[in-house]
């Protein structure tokens, strides 16, 4: 740990059980569902010695090593957690200010909320000799224009986003501008309890949703909104998702949107679906 104490297997037993506990309300608690449970509800994770964990899974999991590389599986310092939140009412309080104990390459030296963070090299890190930067300053801002201006003025060495209207100017014309792939899907979801579905059968409601799906011009959004070579989604699962066995899940997925159809084809099919749901169209639409 950054305070010099040794990280042991028991730190992981504590941290994983804490993250999986409903009382913690961790966003990614479900990632521990692959681990079996003991009779008392705790995870079937045992520290057989100071450096060894025995983990019992509910079933074979080829991607378990990948799961353990996810931050939710990282250890937290039990003394800090319990000191900051003795009654368990605010599980995240221990890390809401700078100075908490951690075990990464850097420790958080200062944190001005919504403004900046300063990280310093952790001399206790197991591989500290290969950590080349002594200090990192991070600007916190949701304003792309402000961060981009700070970059251009030399106040920042790196920014991970730029204003959309700058993309066409930078892409392919500035050697510092790079587009990095990101695994994800932007989608529209429906509140099926909305009054718009009142009085509709299950089939009619499904037709309405399918029609909206057909009427979204993905290519227009990719080209004019995203502008960074995104791929029009033809499935809920994004391209490049691993299937857990070394393959790509997307290749076996069933597309729900045919990117080869023309816009006119999509509109006509959507109109038929809406008509089947009880909508009528006039010459004016």
Where are these regions (language model features)?
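Short helices/loops that flank or line small-molecule/ion binding pockets
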Residues: 4-6, 11, 145-156, 172-173, ...
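Ligand-binding "clamshell"
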Residues: 168-181
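Structural transition elements
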Residues: 232-283
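Gly/Pro-rich hinge or "lid" segments in bacterial periplasmic/extracellular proteins
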Residues: 69-131, 135, 267, 271-272
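Surface-exposed binding/hinge segments that line
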Residues: 11-13, 29-83
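Aromatic- and charge-enriched surface segment that lines or borders ligand/interaction sites
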Residues: 1-26, 54, 202-204, 208-211
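A bilobed periplasmic-binding-protein/Venus flytrap-type ligand-binding module shared by bacterial periplasmic
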Residues: 120-125, 184-211, 224
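Ligand-site clamp/hinge motif
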Residues: 92, 97, 123-169
């Amino acid at each position: 740990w950054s305070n010099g104490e040794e990280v042991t297997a028991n730190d992981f037993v504590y941290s994983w059980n804490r993250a999986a506990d409903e009382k913690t309300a961790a966003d990614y608690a479900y990632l521990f569902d692959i681990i079996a449970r003991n009779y008392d509800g705790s995870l079937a994770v045992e520290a057989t010695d100071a450096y060894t964990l025995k983990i019992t899974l509910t079933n074979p999991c080829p991607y378990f090593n990948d799961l353990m590389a996810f931050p939710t599986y990282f250890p937290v310092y039990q003394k800090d957690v319990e000191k900051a939140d003795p009654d368990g009412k605010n599980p995240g309080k221990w890390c809401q200010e700078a100075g908490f104990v951690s075990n990464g390459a850097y420790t958080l030296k200062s944190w001005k909320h919504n403004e900046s963070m300063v990280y310093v090299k952790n001399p206790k890190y197991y591989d500290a000799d290969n950590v080349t930067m002594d200090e990192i300053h991070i600007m916190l801002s949701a304003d792309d224009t402000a961060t981009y201006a700070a970059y251009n003025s030399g106040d920042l060495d790196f920014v991970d986003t730029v204003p959309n209207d700058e993309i066409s100017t930078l892409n392919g014309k500035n050697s510092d501008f790079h587009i990095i792939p990101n695994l994800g899907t932007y989608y529209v979801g429906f509140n099926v309890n909305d009054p718009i579905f009142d009085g509709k059968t299950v089939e009619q409601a499904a037709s309405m949703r399918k029609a909206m799906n057909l009427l979204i011009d993905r290519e227009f959004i990719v080209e004019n909104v995203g502008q960074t070579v995104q791929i029009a989604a033809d499935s809920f699962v994004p391209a490049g998702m691993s299937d857990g066995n070394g393959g790509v899940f997307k290749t076996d997925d069933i597309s729900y949107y045919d990117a080869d159809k023309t816009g006119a084809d999509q509109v006509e099919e959507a109109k038929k679906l809406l008509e089947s749901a009880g909508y009528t169209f006039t010459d004016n639409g």
